[in-house]
Amino acid sequence: MRASTILYFIAIIFSSFPLLAQEEEDIPFFLIEKHPYYVQTDTITGETKEIPFKIFLDQWVIKNYRYPQEAVEKKIEGRVIVQLRIDKKGILSIKEIIGRNPLLEEEACRIFDGFPQFSPALQRGKPVNILYNYPIVFRLAN
């Protein structure tokens, strides 16, 4: 009797691990029901508007993009893929950077310094962690 009770509790404990793992799983951006968005408040009127994540992200990168001077001098060009993670609280972090040059990778990382908090992505009405791959191309003008 005692052995069967212990086995029962062990089975319950191990069966709950997949549920815990699912809660913290990062979901690809394209599978999300409601994407994250930034709430922008007009300082004069107080009106708010929702800016979709991808639009805000593009604007942020354009505004903060700088070609590293050393890369200019060495004529280094390339593409860097930044894997972004937005957690359940809407906070962005960099999960991975894939590129061929450390100077360009470092600049790609710097671009996201100070990135504001978003309203999180929702899946079935609940906040979820998501992943989004963002390419940044470093190309010198001819």
Put a short name on every predicted segment.
Residues T5-Y8, S15-N142:
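Charge-biased low-complexity segments
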Residues M1-R2:
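N-terminal secretory signal peptides that target proteins for export/translocation
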